[in-house]
Amino acid sequence: MPRIAEARAGAEPSSPRQRARRQSILKVAADAAASTGLERVQMQEVAKSAGVAIATLYRYFPSKTHLFTALMADQIEGFAARVPERPAGTSPEDAVFETLGSATRNLLRRPALATAMIQSANAARASTVPDLARIDSGFLDLLLRAWGVQEATDHHITRLRLLILLWYGVLQSRLNERLTPQEADADLRLACHLLLAPGPDAG
């Protein structure tokens, strides 16, 4: 019988050994979801393949929702670290579009894993899954950097939040094959220009 998701946050690793153990769990979980999809990932098998006790896995990740939300947060942080500076001559809204397009292509390399992470993040509650806040803040910081905004106002944050919600919908439609790559790019580009281009209500 599968373990019922617990309404508590996972423990944070406090030593290099614990951090390595946590990363091993995340890598095994990512490979498993990429191969079988979220529903068929078994926590017992993840623990066994990662070489940890099942109690250790549940200490860090009380449920699959915690596990794959953490994985998405790590992936966004890793992606942000690899994004180059905006090329000269690129408009801010085009730079944000390129960043979102690159994130989309990166996630679609392993569509079953992308679906697992999105489903988990959508099911997570912010009060018990702290990594949800890491996803939100990581994505906002990434797009603010691409946009070239150093001192964000509430209006900046609101526009980016709307754009991120739209991006999730476009990504889900790509995963469901409801949009072609060309349609997805066109929708994202239009959204970036409508929401981010300079105008009388900018700032």
Per-segment meaning from a language model:
Residues 1-8, 140-148, 176-203:
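C-terminal peripheral helix-coil segments that are non-catalytic and often amphipathic
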Residues 1-36, 40-49, 66-69:
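Basic, helix-initiating cap at the start of DNA-binding domains
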Residues 25-33, 75, 103, 167:
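Short hydrophobic clusters on alpha-helical segments that form packing/core surfaces
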Residues 33, 68-75, 117, 121:
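Alpha-helical DNA-contacting segments of helix-turn-helix folds
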Residues 51-61:
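Short hydrophobic/aromatic patch on the recognition helix
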Residues 70, 84-109:
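Hydrophobic alpha-helical connector segments
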Residues 84-85, 116-124:
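Short linear capping/connector segments at secondary-structure termini
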Residues 124-168, 185-193:
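Amphipathic alpha-helical packing segments from all-alpha helical-bundle domains
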